[in-house]
From Swiss-Prot:
Pfam family, one: SHMT
GO biological process: glycine biosynthetic process from serine; tetrahydrofolate interconversion
Location(s) in or outside the cell: Cytoplasm
One Gene Ontology CC term in the entry: cytoplasm
UniProt source species: Mesorhizobium japonicum (strain LMG 29417 / CECT 9101 / MAFF 303099)
Protein name in UniProt: Serine hydroxymethyltransferase 2
Residues at the site labelled Plays an important role in substrate specificity: 233
Residues recorded with modification N6-(pyridoxal phosphate)lysine: 234
């Protein structure tokens, strides 16, 4: 036990050598492996500094100017700063930066807009949607009536005509637009027309593409949607957290919430706190404010467009090597390898790629005959390698690495050789938050 007056002065390696050793191992891994998971990225040193700051010590239940603890004048300024930066970047009327992550943000939307057993339309998980958009094992699929919409049989893209027919027939109270494994641009204008015809709230989940939207590399849903949710990491390169954007007023107030004295923005805030969460993580909000400052720069706009260029280059290189991609390509930061014509499962290929220093995740493909725990696909993403400074030429080399492993999935010597080549390949690039710390 530390002597009085000495607590808190020792470094991590002095206090806990085991955690320090794990940290060093993770750092080495991230410097020598290709991070191709579409939902991962590298936060900057500034974002990491704010995440590990003394703002982690402050309890701040409530909202700026209306806290349940004293001494929050500074964090009031901090949260207000994050809110204003977020609203400015996306052109939103209202913003809430307190959700602990994307799923809690989505749960708050359910609480603010719906009653239990209301109908919810969303893209099913096997076709690119998210658990919280009405999947059967999630609260959204058990507490609400789920009405799935699907993809066109030939293009594997959202079938907006069938979606419209389903919405007219089922008249869901909420329609989700967004996903975790959908490599194409969403037609927010078409979705808004469909939602209006059905008297449905339209909610966009932009967790994967928020950085692309800020950069102008993907359409902005804010003008078309009642509510927009997101994580604060992934392509926007912030801390692990979430946020919600919304209109101030509810266009369906008289229809669905006539007895409520609160407008849409207020109901969103009340759903986050006190209905679902307690004290916000002020260190995360501080880091989000920093990430939003970074995202407002011209260099971030260049970065966002390069993400898409790199994803397209990787897609073209893999197509040229005979691989099939869901939808035939990509418009955003991700691509889905359909490996149903290959001898092994998506999980098996992902494991072999990882041994070769290529980090991916196995993923379901439309019409997947395999169980979700093994799948027939692999999802690849370009945000992290783009943050390292890689461009189109490097994507061609990455495709060659992937092909070497997948063509010889049981040749461990090949995997070991690719692992060495990948490590050498990565040393030519800096890893943000690691190389500069």
């Amino acid at each position: 036990m530390a002597e009085p007056g000495t607590y808190g002065r020792s470094s991590l390696v002095q206090v806990d050598c085991r955690v320090h050793e794990l940290l060093l191992r993770q750092r080495r891994q991230e410097r020598t492996m290709l991070k191709l998971i579409a939902s991962e990225n590298f936060a900057s040193s500034a974002v990491l500094e704010a995440t590990g700051s003394i703002f982690a010590n402050k309890y701040a239940e409530g909202y700026p100017g209306a806290r349940y603890y004293a001494g929050n004048e500074i964090v009031d300024e901090l949260e207000t700063l994050a809110i204003e930066r977020l609203k400015a970047l996306f052109g939103s009327e209202h913003a809430n930066v307190q959700p602990y992550s994307g799923s809690p943000a989505n749960q708050a939307v359910y609480r603010a807009l719906l009653s239990p057993r209301d109908k919810v339309m969303g893209l099913p998980l096997p076709e690119g949607g998210h658990l919280t958009h009405g999947w059967s094992v999630n609260f959204s699929g058990t507490d609400y009536q789920r009405v799935p919409y699907g993809l066109h049989d030939k293009t594997q893209q959202i079938d907006y005509d069938r979606l419209r027919e389903t919405a007219r027939r089922e008249r869901p109270k909420l329609i989700w637009v967004g996903g975790t494994s959908y490599p194409r641009v969403f037609d927010y204008a078409a979705m808004a027309e469909i939602a209006l015809e059905a008297n449905s709230y339209l909610v966009a989940d932009i967790a994967h593409i928020s950085g692309l939207i800020v950069a102008g590399a993907h359409p902005n849903p804010v003008v078309h949607c009642d509510v927009v949710t997101s994580t604060s990491h992934k392509s926007i390169r912030g801390p692990r957290g979430g946020f919600i954007l919304s209109k101030n007023e509810d266009r369906y107030q008289a229809l669905y919430h006539s007895t409520s004295k609160h407008n849409l923005a207020k109901r969103i805030d009340r759903a986050v706190f006190p209905q679902l969460q307690g004290g916000p993580h002020m260190n995360t909000i501080a880091a989000l404010a920093v990430a939003l400052q970074e995202a407002a720069t011209p260099s971030f706009r260049t970065y966002g467009h390069q993400i898409v260029k790199n994803a397209k280059a990787l897609a073209e290189a893999l197509l040229g090597r005979g691989y099939y991609l869901v939808t035939g390509g990509t418009d955003n930061h991700m691509l889905i390898l359909d490996l149903r014509d290959r001898p092994l499962s998506g999980k098996a290929y992902a494991e072999r790629l990882a041994r070769a220093g290529i980090i991916t995740n196995f993923d379901m493909v439309p019409g997947d005959p395999r169980d979700p725990t093994v799948t027939s696909g692999i999802r690849l993403g370009s945000p992290a390698v783009t943050s390292m400074g890689m461009r189109e030429a490097e994507m061609v080399q990455i495709a060659a690495f992937i092909d070497s492993v997948c063509r010889q999935p049981d040749d461990q010597e090949v995997h070991a050789s690719v692992r060495r080549d990948v490590a050498d390949f990565c040393t030519a690039f800096d890893v943000p938050g690691i190389s500069d710390r």
